[in-house]
Amino acid sequence: MKKLIPVNPVLALAIVLLAFSNATRSQGPPRAADTLHYPEEKNFRNIRQLTFGGDNAEAYWSYDSKHIVFQRTSMKDGIPCDQIYVGKLPETPGEPFTYKRISSGKGRTTCAFFTKDNKHIVYGSTHLGGDECPPIPDRSKYGNRYIWPIYASYDIFMADLDGNIKKQLTNTPGYDAEATLSPDGKKMLFTSTRDGDLDLYCMDMKSEKVKRITTQLGYDGGAWFSNDGKKIIWRASRPKTEAEVKEYKELLAEGLVAPTNMEVWVANADGSDAKQITQLGQANWAPNFMPDGRVIFCSNHEYKRGFPFNMYTMNADGSNIVKISRDKGFDAFPMFSPDGKKIIFCSNRNNGGTRDTNIFVADWVE
């Protein structure tokens, strides 16, 4: 059986780079002991691991902070590509983390987010395009470059917590995914190829009217609202040279993208006054606003070899970058609880030397 790998761009990129690292140092010293909490991680307290095994990613809080929604792949558990799960967060140290699948088990899913009533989620799914996991592109046909697919069969759906799909929110040709909601739950940001490029759009959840809010050539995705709903933050590629533009357009025409060069952008919620706030090179990913208006994001910019990925904080203008996580593989997808007291993220830490990515929650301290 052909092994399927996760098609979450930054997670898959990390796996590729770590596999290369493991191969090149196979004759080197033994791997260091697993670590749940590194001494340098001064902002984390009472860190707890919620999942154990598989690839668990994009874990995001409900508005009442009682549950999280996330996507999960686990070959050993018969989950060959990402499906969506909801779990109740433990209230005491001895309470286990329990979760259940709420996507259909058909196709591939991605990027789930709770609605304001805490009774529904929105997520992207390819299930209308077929029951099987859509195929992974053969990188050898593209010079072994790191690429990932933009499945045209992705649309965004709303489901209740029993998995019943209540509404299809997008129904246009091409990719529609990467949805997040505003703090008041009235607006939905998402990425779409409906106008020929990978751009950001905003949907009014009541009228379902959609407005395009980015227009520059390049991949715009992973967008979030600020805590007051007035700003948005996202990561974007901006091909500039003739060769870069040619490569980007050729890959996009085949439903592919090479997400290895991304920077963090901010704008007003309507897309106006857009500004690039990082100039770091490599992959700067998963940006989100902190409770005090600063920014937290994931990056591999410190490492020429492309890994590890760690989390950093910075001011909203890109100044004062501070490294806050220290795993030797992968730390990403940070989100603060609505009350700002806790942080949830995904990491390769404490995985017994495997490539598993798990979910962690911690108290946040300054």
Task: List where the protein language model places each region.
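Bacterial Sec-dependent N-terminal signal peptides
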Residues: M1-G28
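Multi-bladed beta-propeller domains
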Residues: A32-D55, G87-R108, D160-Y175, M203-Y219, ...
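A flexible loop/linker signature enriched in serine peptidases of the S9 family
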Residues: F52-D55, Q71-I84, S104-T109, G124-D155, ...
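Beta-hairpin (beta-strand-turn-beta-strand) motif
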Residues: L89, G105-G107, T115-N118, G124-G129, ...
